Amino acid sequence: MSNIRVRFAPSPTGALHMGGARTALFNWLFARQNGGKFILRIEDTDFRRSREDSAQGIVEGLSWLGLDWDEGPDIGGPLGPYRQSERGDIYSRYLQELLDSGQAYYCFCSPEDLQKEREEAAQEKRDYKYGGRCKALKPEEASEMLQAGKPAVIRLKVPLDGNTVVPDLIRGDVSFSNALFDDFIIAKSDGWPTYNFAVVVDDFSMQISHVLRAEEHLSNTPRQLLIYRALGLKEPAFAHLSMILAPDRSKLSKRHGAISVQEFENQGYLPEALVNYLALLGWSTGKDIDIWSREEMMREFSLEHISKSPAIYDLEKLAWMNGQYMMRLDIESLMALVEPQAQQQGWLNEDNFDYFQQAVELVRNRAKTRDELLDALGYFFEEVKQYDEKGVKKHFGQQKASTMLSEVLEIVSNMGSFSAAELEEAFRQRAQELKIKAADLIHPTRLALSGRTATPGLFELMEVLGQEKCISRLEKALDFIAKLTTHGPEGHNHR
């Protein structure tokens, strides 16, 4: 395809969420695959709700995801401005063109007049449509009322019969009866255009070839086509992306884990993983592949492979995918991911860098997210403050628990060197001497050293912790078991 120009046009009234990020990604992929341009436009004419910090957050979110744009409010371009709030003169010219051609008119009906019409429609049990009383006003009458300072909106004259067909590249032709529409407002009483008018003028004047956007905008598209045709402008191609639903097929919300892109970044998710996951929300090549590089996505992406059916958001799958990307990181990148938090916690300083690296290496495959990785690192740097409740019942609550840990303490105290291989050999030899399973020594030791029932391999864990820490924690665990035997299981905290 030639001269492909697509845009992502968010309203800065909140954060960049998953739906918006997916829309941006699909536009970006389509542009990059076809050698086209990806334009960022900020639709900020809702002056009451638009916020500059939201606009900045959206820009930062796209940058973090690696979705670079070719034209936009920060870098400019030949067809700007790229903020609607700076395009007032452009909109005014096109509005005047419609007024001059008789395809639009001023409406002076007051809110009270319109409310009365709505109430009459409700009483008669019919859908409300504007009655069109101002359509009959002569130009000189409208001019007199404007000069008198009477507030007015501008309405488009909509054909009373026929259909408006939306040719959709994903859904095929979608037909809307013109009888559904009234003469809808295209400019408010303050002179600023409504969304549907502004977006038509912007897309045409920025030479947008394809409009890829969420399915929720499909109902706006026939109104926009009516505006294109009234102005005699070339229409872009449209493709409406299916909705993203929660696992129970309800509307997606924060309670389903659908947080903003910035919140995912703050939680330490990797941008590559989020981009990969977003791409699979509604796009599939039919290949049984979950992990796609950006280059592979750009090569394979096509509108033909976008589903009409809703995509299902699955936070567990996203976490799994993030884990796959974390496993592929080299140790330096993985350490950089957790260093700020580790330093903040007081875990990392110039004296224990090697120890920190060994700990990260050991637990790296047990974490799907940065926060899980930090959680897995905790007991390497902080004393065990609480033992797992089920673990206490299973491994510390038995009469032999104290005996088992005493045996381990003796083994550990008498070790010359402290390698994982030598520790394992010593444990298994002692288990053989005591005619017990090695697991009878291993499980209570794991709980004593970490407070947990699941960790990386115990002997590797012990080697990293070091002999001194292991002895100290075994002694504390024995003390805890003694109190447990004396006082009963009132609680599992210890200081």
UniProtKB/Swiss-Prot annotation:
Chain span(s) of sequence motif 'KMSKS' region: 251-255
Signal peptide per UniProt: none
Keyword Amino-acid biosynthesis carried by entry: no
Residues involved in ATP binding: 254
Motif segment ('HIGH' region): 10-20
Molecular function per GO: ATP binding; glutamate-tRNA ligase activity; tRNA binding; zinc ion binding
Keywords, comma-separated and alphabetical: Aminoacyl-tRNA synthetase, ATP-binding, Cytoplasm, Ligase, Nucleotide-binding, Protein biosynthesis
Name of protein: Glutamate--tRNA ligase 1
Organism for this UniProt entry: Syntrophomonas wolfei subsp. wolfei (strain DSM 2245B / Goettingen)
Gene that encodes the chain: gltX1
